[in-house]
Amino acid sequence: MTSVWKRLQRVGKRAAKFQFVACYHELVLECTKKWQPDKLVVVWTRRNRRICSKAHSWQPGIQNPYRGTVVWMVPENVDISVTLYRDPHVDQYEAKEWTFIIENESKGQRKVLATAEVDLARHAGPVPVQVPVRLRLKPKSVKVVQAELSLTLSGVLLREGRATDDDMQSLASLMSVKPSDVGNLDDFAESDEDEAHGPGAPEARARVPQPDPSRELKTLCEEEEEGQGRPQQAVASPSNAEDTSPAPVSAPAPPARTSRGQGSERANEAGGQVGPEAPRPPETSPEMRSSRQPAQDTAPTPAPRLRKGSDALRPPVPQGEDEVPKASGAPPAGLGSARETQAQACPQEGTEAHGARLGPSIEDKGSGDPFGRQRLKAEEMDTEDRPEASGVDTEPRSGGREANTKRSGVRAGEAEESSAVCQVDAEQRSKVRHVDTKGPEATGVMPEARCRGTPEAPPRGSQGRLGVRTRDEAPSGLSLPPAEPAGHSGQLGDLEGARAAAGQEREGAEVRGGAPGIEGTGLEQGPSVGAISTRPQVSSWQGALLSTAQGAISRGLGGWEAEAGGSGDLETETEVVGLEVLGTQEKEVEGSGFPETRTLEIEILGALEKEAARSRVLESEVAGTAQCEGLETQETEVGVIETPGTETEVLGTQKTEAGGSGVLQTRTTIAETEVLVTQEISGDLGPLKIEDTIQSEMLGTQETEVEASRVPESEAEGTEAKILGTQEITARDSGVREIEAEIAESDILVAQEIEVGLLGVLGIETGAAEGAILGTQEIASRDSGVPGLEADTTGIQVKEVGGSEVPEIATGTAETEILGTQEIASRSSGVPGLESEVAGAQETEVGGSGISGPEAGMAEARVLMTRKTEIIVPEAEKEEAQTSGVQEAETRVGSALKYEALRAPVTQPRVLGSQEAKAEISGVQGSETQVLRVQEAEAGVWGMSEGKSGAWGAQEAEMKVLESPENKSGTFKAQEAEAGVLGNEKGKEAEGSLTEASLPEAQVASGAGAGAPRASSPEKAEEDRRLPGSQAPPALVSSSQSLLEWCQEVTTGYRGVRITNFTTSWRNGLAFCAILHRFYPDKIDYASLDPLNIKQNNKQAFDGFAALGVSRLLEPADMVLLSVPDKLIVMTYLCQIRAFCTGQELQLVQLEGGGGAGTYRVGSAQPSPPDDLDAGGLAQRLRGHGAEGPQEPKEAADRADGAAPGVASRNAVAGRASKDGGAEAPRESRPAEVPAEGLVNGAGAPGGGGVRLRRPSVNGEPGSVPPPRAHGSFSHVRDADLLKKRRSRLRNSSSFSMDDPDAGAMGAAAAEGQAPDPSPAPGPPTAADSQQPPGGSSPSEEPPPSPGEEAGLQRFQDTSQYVCAELQALEQEQRQIDGRAAEVEMQLRSLMESGANKLQEEVLIQEWFTLVNKKNALIRRQDQLQLLMEEQDLERRFELLSRELRAMLAIEDWQKTSAQQHREQLLLEELVSLVNQRDELVRDLDHKERIALEEDERLERGLEQRRRKLSRQLSRRERCVLS
């Protein structure tokens, strides 16, 4: 498919269609010995277009038999049609290369021998010309020594037009065709001589597929998942193959290998209990699970995945076929779905959604697998060490296995919906097999664990979603979480290794906690778990938990967050297992401990309020404790994580008992879990920490208790509960059922809570809390060095708690905040108010909703989210690329509300100073970044969920957009930073230059851009507004999910429109028409559209949007010719449409010369410039400038002075005219356009503010300004010929002038300064400006202009100096963006095709959207400059330039950089020059008039004289006659 970016680049350009004809004359080909070509074909090709000549035989030469020729006795002509593009102000066409390829045709196969490229733009011209060409081709085969092709090339211009005209489109480039069968020459692998030195041959041989035993076992999976990369299979397969025989599975290995249906049936027959059961369709009822007869499994589903021995234990994971690509919000089928199937008859949706996300999670898991295996081993050790625990299950184990198998079967049915799950299963299988090899008990446990664990491991990522989904479908909430990034898994791996060392200890905890992931699944099963047999579950849970916990750990804290987030369910299940393991004791502990925890938390909050210093110390201690705990947790990470889950469950139970308060407790528990996770993460981050963790773990739960005591008591209790849980594990048997009952209760409560309206807040909260805690604790580590920050945190917490209307909620929030907020405070340390606002917003939400528990949870989640964001912010400063990803993740994780709240604090930390930020960042950056990435992955996973999570994601995305502006001195600088364009400069700018005052302004600007002015408490207002999701105009598109949801929302209610993806949903054009009709009903008659008329529907929509100013990327042919439209093009086009329709188009604030990136902001209406910028002020400026004119020759200066009064008066007139005309309002720095002409460029933001005219091109230093134009230069302004000459001169003097490259460079810089679109008029200094440190935070601190540049400036005298400079700067900026966009598009397309890394794909999509928005801003700005440059009417030109100057003068002098000041000087010079020209015109007119009057008088006198003379003659005649 044609490049999306190239289409975007063509917008606004001129196109010319040429017909090129190549006439072949001779081909000379020299070959190596022992080989000669058979038939030779010359191919003229570009992309997928191939024009082939006839096949000709090669005739060896007489002198050199290895050098032969092909001679065309009758020249052979081949012709092609090519569309070439050029900028409107340039005559040279852009390069377009076509390639000549020499191919050898032998036995029906073609091999490439040599190639050469020809740039057709060099041969294109208005006049047909024939050019003889002799091409030296580059050999592509070792068999070719030399090749030359002689031909004649001619080009004929067919027609010219706009790049977007229908007849300019190349159908061939619209078609997405697979390349032909001509492969790169493998150098004829069949020849023996090539084996030694022919690189192609070995490769070719290596490519030959060789049977792989492990793959044979997975034939079904592979076939089902064909086309989807399964990187993990290879890794897992060897171990699977090895483990197959030892696996204690009753089913023999051979049956496992059987293919598809047969395999499953045979396995069932042969392997009584364990035989792989055919995956059950999601409809399978829970009874099927409970039943233990494999025979009962439904007939093998179409493609049951037969896994090797132990694989059978694992539920085959169904692929989500259609859903996979969507990454829908439904929880992944994996574990959750299996249980969901039981709990709900319709888990398929969730499953499919899960499938979509499974992909990434699987990969992550793959990386985490090694650790998972270690965990498994540790678990095995554990099971061996604790025969009781395993023993409990041992009896029913066979039954348990069956049950598990069946569950796995059920899951399998669901699992098949998600290919990712399959991969996860493969990984887990290997783990399971490890366990199996060690012992039947372990095997029994592990298989079951695998059955559950496998899905579970995946579910964690999706659990993040689960959090969201859980609320929707309480039971089916388990979704497979995307695995955390490989980096995380690597770190986790280290931790896991340490844990493996302390395996037994952990196992106790893991048995409890290990279940969390698995039990998360159990949650949904809740009662079904009990029905199946709690003990077997427990044992299996242990194994599974261990594996799961390890998997979770390997996946990363992010996974845990997802679990916690998803969590109500996961934790509940975890609790089910954990509770079972812990037994009643844990109940008691939890029951007694949690209330105490609340009290303690409240007390802690109070103490924090009273003693900030103490709180700091405590916080540092807490941070240390958290780390210690993290270490312990890491040991028991599984245990801890699970334990938190257990605690959460207990809390849930208590919730049942305590009612609403229980919810808070649950959240608190979640927060604790997150804290633990965070700590673990921090431990993971540092190997030393890991060691410490191991040590602390070794020390025993006592340490955990001690640490817990340091941490809020709730956490301490949690750890204690976990500790007790270990002890209770022994007593597990007795308390299992009770625990299960409690678990069921907690599950129900959790489900209820979820239903009540957590809206995914639990998931978000958990994820957010975890992320926050993770980041927070890391921050805490950082903060430990910054007591002040912690003190602030304390204050914030106090404020939040006190301000909260719901004390319980506040307590929970405070608790979370204590765990996470304190650290956040450290981050946001300077901004207690913001946090308090956040708390207030949370309270407000809680109060308004009336659901204190859930609301409080939401508030907490937001707080956590906020912290997370804050954490990210400091990181962003130092590692912007990471930050961007992290921010995205965070945004997704948190709701938009949270983000806004977070933003303020985030910016504040920067305000606090780079030192603090650096201190925080330095210690935690790497870990935080990783954590954030993990979270990001999770966030991305559930951010993509289509359900509520989707809504949250969209808002978050919006928040991200707003956030970036605030965080990064420029709305888009942040994103640029993400793209790596700005680099660290942005962070420095933000830190150094952002002032608290500017932050609010930036927020206001972004808020305005979003179309939602903020209330006095922006956080509250934004949160309240955005909760519904659609009330406030969305910010710039930042994720594919948010874009999809916006489209769905906007097209709701339109006939025949159902949007579920970015491809087929848009093909018939009705969806585009619906969006157009929604915002511009007068542009299209929707009722008259025919759903079957694809071409016409799309044409109407595209034409309508093009008329409004939306860059035209799609053509009706795209939709007609392709049954599945190109996803990236559709997404990009919709991104533009959304930005336009919501008024969120980017505005170019200023361009930076010298390679610096420009500054952009969301196009929001800006207040008009101060009134003092009236004509009088302008005139004064002009007058003063004319007087100063340092470089002007005296003569010119005198003229300028003399003209000043006239200038002033004219300025006044022009100024008033512009004001009256409304030009000022649109102030879009669309200098060249009059408001009526759509200065806003259809952006819908007439107040888009003028661009800050900045002319970095001259290198930011006020260089010598050329004197005003010599007089007389415009004496014949209206002479058409002169106008044409003038334009040609302008072209020559522009950047394209060959003789004065310096001038071009300078112009480019200047152009850059103003390149943006309706460049926002700098009204009051925009946030971006204020953020720009006067010294040069702006990337363009350029050296003084070189003499060559000064000369270039002089050359601008004949044209518009200002406009030329701006255009050249614009070109520089475009080159930068184009270079990055080409890379991003390639990466994005490869990721979209493979679906391998959804997280990375989402990050790239956000960067892509940002680049597209910037490109459109530059296009709009270029249009303005083009209009300005072509404007020849002096009056109008003067008006436009004066408007530009007004926009610049709206900025305070002290805020202007040297480049801006120089640009202003250029503008003044241009205006002075214009005034001089006008004066000259007036003088000329006066002079001509005087001459004319004199002539008239002379003629009159002459006539009078003639009359007198005639009269005298007549009188004489009369006399004569009379006489």
UniProtKB/Swiss-Prot annotation:
CDD domains in alphabetical order: CH_EHBP1L1 (cd21255)
Q: Where is the composition biased (Polar residues)?
A: 230-243
PTM per Swiss-Prot/TrEMBL? Prenylated. Farnelysation (predominant) and geranylgeranylation has been observed in vitro.
Q: Where is this region: Disordered?
A: 179-536, 963-1036, 1183-1352
Q: PTM Phosphothreonine: at which residues?
A: 454
Kindly give the SUPFAM superfamilies that the UniProt entry links to this protein.
Answer: Calponin-homology domain, CH-domain
- PTM Phosphoserine: list the residues: 170, 173, 191, 285, 310, 367, 430, 895, 964, 1168, 1257, 1273
Compositional bias (Basic and acidic residues) spans?
376-405, 426-439, 1017-1027, 1191-1201, 1217-1231
Q: Which domain of life is it from?
A: Eukaryota
Q: Please list the coiled coil stretches.
A: 1363-1515
In this chain the Calponin-homology (CH) domain maps to 1037-1142
Keywords attached to this entry: Coiled coil, Endosome, Phosphoprotein
Any Pfam family from its record, for instance, is NT-C2
**Motif CAAX motif at which residues?**
1520-1523
Q: What is its main location?
A: other
Domain C2 NT-type: from-to ranges? 8-157
- Where does the record place the bMERB domain? 1349-1501
Write out the annotated subcellular location.
Endosome
Q: Locations of Low complexity compositional bias?
A: 327-338, 1005-1016, 1303-1316, 1326-1340
User: GO terms for CC?
Assistant: endosome; membrane
Report if keyword Transmembrane is assigned: no
Role this protein plays: May act as Rab effector protein and play a role in vesicle trafficking.
Assembly, in brief, is: Interacts with RAB8A, RAB10, RAB13 and RAB15 (in their GTP-bound forms); at least in case of RAB8A can bind 2 molecules of RAB8A simultaneously; ternary complex formation of RAB8A, RAB13 and EHBP1L1 is possible.
Q: What is known of its domains?
A: The CAAX motif is a signal for prenylation and required for endosomal colocalization with Rab8 and Rab10. The bivalent Mical/EHBP Rab binding (bMERB) domain, mediates binding to Rab8, Rab10, Rab10, Rab13 and Rab15 (in their GTP-bound forms).
Its protein name is EH domain-binding protein 1-like protein 1
What is the organism lineage in this UniProt record? Eukaryota, Metazoa, Chordata, Craniata, Vertebrata
